[in-house]
Structure formats: C-alpha cells, structure tokens
Amino acid sequence: MAKEEIKIIAQNKKAYHDYFIEETYEAGIVLSGTEVKSIRMGKVNLKDSFARVENNEVYLYNMHISPYEKGNIFNKDPLRTRKLLLNRHEINKLIGYVTRKGYTLIPTKLYLKRGLVKVELAVARGKKLYDKREDIARRDAKSELEKHFKEKQLGI
C-alpha cells in the first residue's frame, strides 16, 4: 500500500520543552471553510493552545487561526473554541488521564492527512525547572561529545 502523505502545517515545539509527553492521539477538528483555507496557507499558531474535556467532548482553546484575506463576512473569531473529533473510547481514556493531578492536553502538531485537517493531541505532564535544566545539560553534553569525537577523527 502507498504511504499516507502527511503535510505538517504547524508544530508546538515549546510543548516538548515544557512538558513530558506521555501519549499522543490523532483528532479531527471542526472548522469553517475560511479557517481551512487559512490553515492550508500556514497561518496558524499552536503556541499557547490547550485542550479541555467538557460534557464528554474535547475542545481546543487558544489556537490562533488568522482570518482568511478573501473571507469577508465568513471569517470567524481567530481564537474561538474548536471542537475536536475523537472516538468515545479515546475520550474516556483522556478523561482518565486529565482527572489525575498534573496531566493536561496539549496540541503538538497540526497537519493535513488525505485532505483533512488533523491535530496531534498529547497527554502531557508539566516539567519542573530542574527537569528543563537537566535536558539542556544532557543536550550540551551530547554536542560536546560529538564535537570531541569529530576532532579526534580529523586528528586535531
């Protein structure tokens, strides 16, 4: 079978810095026509967005989709709440995670899959400051090792 083509439109890189990602889910999203056109043009921001479960439905908050230039009266509010489309089983699992202390739902990616806009929703646990410092130290040590190894190979 042919591999499904996925075009990533937006990523929330800050989420990987601020949270431990436990599990990810793929969700559809309810949008209007002008929002889809704006997303296809890449005018979307996931930076401060989060999801919440209300009345056994999942909603996405603070995802900024810039108004479509040619949308006129059909443009919606850029920061409006958007409903996510998940199976009942997945929603029940998310409810179980979110009721535990310290867990939250964060969108990590927004992409097109077979012409449909999808959101990768992550169950995340917040990092403490020392966890962030530890990650930075680990990354620096790795780059230092690679630099040292490269110098050794070149004979410097």
Swiss-Prot record:
Annotated Pfam families: SmpB (PF01668)
**GO terms (BP aspect):** trans-translation
Q: Which family does it belong to?
A: Belongs to the SmpB family.
Return the CDD domains for the record: SmpB
| Described function | Required for rescue of stalled ribosomes mediated by trans-translation. Binds to transfer-messenger RNA (tmRNA), required for stable association of tmRNA with ribosomes. tmRNA and SmpB together mimic tRNA shape, replacing the anticodon stem-loop with SmpB. tmRNA is encoded by the ssrA gene; the 2 termini fold to resemble tRNA(Ala) and it encodes a 'tag peptide', a short internal open reading frame. During trans-translation Ala-aminoacylated tmRNA acts like a tRNA, entering the A-site of stalled ribosomes, displacing the stalled mRNA.
State what protein this is by name.
Answer: SsrA-binding protein
SUPFAM superfamilies to which the protein is assigned, alphabetical = Small protein B (SmpB) (SSF74982)
Subcellular localization is given as:
Cytoplasm
HAMAP family referenced in this protein's UniProt entry, alphabetically: SmpB (MF_00023)
- Give a Gene Ontology cellular component term annotated to this protein: cytosol
The record, for InterPro entries, names: SmpB, SsrA-bd_prot, SsrA-bd_prot_CS
Q: Name one GO molecular function term.
A: RNA binding
